[in-house]
Amino acid sequence: MNSNKFSINNLKEVEKYSINKLTEYEINNLNFIKVMFGNSSKAGNGFEYKIDEINETDNWHPETKDAKRIGGFNFSVEEKILRWLVRGDTLYDVILPNDADVYDCESPSAPHGVFRSNKIIISNPRPVTDEMAMNFYNKSILPEKSYFKAMAGCSIRGYVNTAIKIFNDKVNKSNFEIAFSEFKDFIIPNGEDTFSEDYLGNNTRKIYDMFLNFEK
């Protein structure tokens, strides 16, 4: 990133369900990162990324101007990645080739936190740790409800200290019910409709018990 004061807060608001194309200046002044399991995407057909090489997709439809239909490769920034840490165990730096098209995609849970491109280079793979998660939390800029989801995600991934920190910082008497609801909803496995304590593991139960013991 250059030494000026440009940040994600300078990006134009993305309209609902829509996308905004980034300028070269914006691309060059943001630090992009990506998290996934190993070098494979769990979305779609399980695309395996090449490291330090250009990855290019045929599934690219910016003409739709639709955040859900644009396709391409997704990635984020440090201020937003906390929301997506549940989706992987390995963090990568993202480099955009000079001829890549890059779009900021509307995301209510992480505004200016979902970017997509037709071409991407990933580099510098490193395992995500609790310490890294804590660092991302300290840098994070997210809507309140997203912190409750991120708290659940961190507990699922084993970043317990970060999850506890989020709980202590963000959960209070006025938002307790929504926080507990968001946490439980995030724990429910795919294919199930309602929460059960049977879905809790050792780490998620620690946060669950903090809710049960919270003095309202």
Residue spans of the language-model regions?
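Short, flexible beta-strand-to-coil junctions
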Residues: V35-K42, V94-D99, S155
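Charged, long alpha-helical assembly modules
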Residues: D169-K216
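Active-site-proximal loop/hinge segments that shape catalytic or ion-binding/gating pockets
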Residues: P108-F176
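Intrinsic-disorder/low-complexity regions
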Residues: M1-S3, I8-N9, I19, I27-L30, ...
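Intrinsically disordered, low-complexity, compositionally biased regions/tails
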Residues: K42, E48-K50, S76, S117, ...
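ADP-ribose/NAD+-binding catalytic cleft of ART/PARP-like enzymes
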Residues: M1-I70, L212-F214
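ADP-ribosyltransferase catalytic core
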Residues: L11, F32, D58-V128
